[in-house]
Amino acid sequence: MGETRRHSVDVPITRTLVALRRVRSLRDPCTTSMSKFASLLDNVKWETGSNNGISLQFVEHADDACKAAADAPVGLIPFGSYSIMEELESGCDLHKLSSKVINVEGDACSRSSERSCSDLSVKGRDLACNAPSISHVEEAGSGGRYRTHYSTKLASSVGEYGSRLGSPMNSTNHSYYGDEDVDFDSQSNRGCGITYCWSRTPRYRGSNQSSDVEEYPLLPGNGNGESDVVTPSHEVLSRSLSQKFRPKSFDELVGQEVVVKCLLSTILRGRITSVYLFHGPRGTGKTSTSKIFAAALNCLSQAAHSRPCGLCSECKSYFSGRGRDVMETDSGKLNRPSYLRSLIKSASLPPVSSRFKVFIIDECQLLCQETWGTLLNSLDNFSQHSVFILVTSELEKLPRNVLSRSQKYHFSKVCDADISTKLAKICIEEGIDFDQGAVDFIASKSDGSLRDAEIMLDQLSLLGKRITTSLAYKLIGVVSDDELLDLLDLAMSSDTSNTVIRARELMRSKIDPMQLISQLANVIMDIIAGNSQESSSATRLRFLTRHTSEEEMQKLRNALKILSDAEKHLRASKNQTTWLTVALLQLSNTDSSSFATDENGRNQINKDVELSSTSSGCPGDVIKSDAEKGQERNCNETVESVWKTVTDLCCSDSLKRFLWKRGRLTSLTVDKGVAIAELEFYTPQHVARAEKSWKLIADSFQSVLGCNVEIQMNLVISACSPPKSAKAAASLFFGLFSCSRRMLHKSYLTTRTDSDCASEKPAVTNSLRSCQGNVLRARSVRSSANASSRMSCSSDQGDATSAMCTPHIPPGEKRPEDDTDVLCWKKTPLGKGQSETQNSKSSRLIGRVLPCSTAAN
């Protein structure tokens, strides 16, 4: 009965003492509340009964405390049971001290306590830099049992040790729980110093490890380059190869020698600007260079060429993620006004402990216009120690003001040889077996991006024990060169069925049509350029043996053109497989004879002189010598051969027969890469039919001549049989007018008269020229004063060919200006008993020609 009454009195006293300690500590955090009770706590023992809570007993000797600890079934571990003084006197090695473990079972009736002083693997853990244990986090979530692990940081004196042992409110150790919500943004706010209270509410207190190294800026180490201060490793978890082998110094950058040299010179000479702009393709090292440059700006090493050294306090704090003067951000955050204001305020203040305050903005092309305006307006108000490093892969999207106020550095694509060397080093360091051909293939497919190459290498290392070329083909989804050469050989050998089967197999299992046609084009270009690999396969050598002649090379060039045209159709088509199959079948349609005819025709055209003959209204005005007549005969033979070649190349047999029987090539002029071909037809129906097929005719001319072609179609009408009425002539004129506007190429539509006999008068005819949908004015020439209008004629056989002419303007009247409309007149042949005056009165207006400033005068 007395024992029960004694415990009932002790419990309120114990609670009162605990409350008093907490109130004093909260009221005055700088004061150690237990220091007032140091004399009482020198010999103290905490004990809890099985059912009666905590009782405080004072003992006079530490031995009694140890003896009482053995009798106490449950409670705190007594102070006297540890030989702390012996360990402190021997050197206070934290790694040799064991931590105290309290295991609280869920059973309220039976509790047991255990302590361990030496078995660290089961009952405790070492104190190393206050780093949280991953195993503890995993054990925190176990059900049915609540187990907590405390780590104790020893003090430097016995009195302080006793006070901290008695009151956990002033302890500076760090506890981590699996359900603990850590706010990393408030690490600088240390609070009152309370790590956790007795209500078991966990609180995070950031470690102030920088205070351990502030007194040693260069950290001389132990003589072997190692630092005395132990820092946590930031490569604990396994990462991808691109992250693991990210450059940490300028020497590790690949393929950017010019940029590295310029940045090192900037640091050496101290010519630091406010804004740097790193631009270039993705995966070329822009972001890594910005981080290295930021660390080099604040590095404390005396040797500028070795910055960042990685040994000084600034380098260690930055690379461990604790640098306060280097901030990395992205465009998404900066587009928020609150975050932007915070950044501007921070940039206006001097750095905390470093030399420069560096702001790295990645993907800066995503910043909005308002953000750019605010940054540029505030740039002059920033501290002179603030440096901005902008990183972008799309330079054209940045405002011009940013480009003019920044120092730009272009990061070019990394060459395949450098990428291959880097990948080989990674494989050797990681112990990965590889084929050199596979590494070279990865480098060629990375398109100058080292990061993409490292990612592909990382994926291949997960697929098998050895990286091979076939494995790389399967991963990337491309076809090997041997398979491409087999398909190309089948397509060019007119093996239709096998070509279709092979193409469908490739597209069904490995590759899409767009990528297949691109690979075929690349293989053909390599063969034409003469690029041969050192270790060429048997398939490649066999293909090169068959296709080495000039005729086969011409076939390959034609195949490249067909594939280029097919790629345009594939981009706009939903059925890409069909279009690609059609393109492959077209590779064997053209035989060698057509190519030989093509080349011969072009060589003859290049040797020809300009074919244009002059004529006048009367025969005999121009007397030709025998040499000129012989040259003209040769030219006529050349024109006839060209015309025959053009008609033979027409796809339609009916069009081929029509052009050969009903049409004639009368003149062909090649000037400055443009050929002008004049065709003659004898009826309006023939002209209309030729106009409907003008595209096919133009394609045939371009295939033979190899240059742009302007087609002029002339209608030859005999003066003895003029149109029966003016209405028929007008309909003929407007019919030709409508056809000319539909033509894509520049065309000449001319109505001609045949003047074989000298007694016939030439009839005035109509000429139209279309240029981008406009009808142009032709030259007007007056050959005599008796005629009201006269034509400038151009014919190789003395025929009178008329151009668009203007009516005769009597003296005293104003001549129309160049930009005014020109009238087109119809003049009929003179009959018996009619004079020029009578005929001019019978002329009537049948059309109006639009002016064009580009027309030739």
UniProtKB/Swiss-Prot annotation:
Keywords: ATP-binding, Coiled coil, Metal-binding, Nucleotide-binding, Zinc
One MF term in the entry's GO annotations: DNA-directed DNA polymerase activity
InterPro entries: DNA_pol3_clamp-load_cplx_C, DNA_pol_III_sug/sutau_N, DNA_Rep/Repair_Clamp_Loader, DnaA_N-like_STI, HLD_clamp_pol_III_gamma_tau, P-loop_NTPase
Keyword Chaperone among record annotations: no
Recorded superkingdom: Eukaryota
GO BP term, example: DNA replication
A single GO cellular-component term on record: DNA polymerase III complex
Bias-annotated ranges (Polar residues): 834-843
Coiled-coil residues: 544-576
Residues where ATP binds: 280-287
Positions of Zn(2+) binding: 299, 309, 312, 315
Disulphide-bonded residues: none
Biased composition (Basic and acidic residues): 599-610
Matching Pfam families: DNA_pol3_delta2, DnaA_N-like_STI, DNAX_ATPase_lid
Positions of the UniProt region annotated as Disordered: 593-629, 787-845
Family: Belongs to the DnaX/STICHEL family.
Protein name (database record): Protein STICHEL-like 2
Organism, scientific name: Arabidopsis thaliana
Lineage, uppermost ranks: Eukaryota, Viridiplantae, Streptophyta, Embryophyta, Tracheophyta
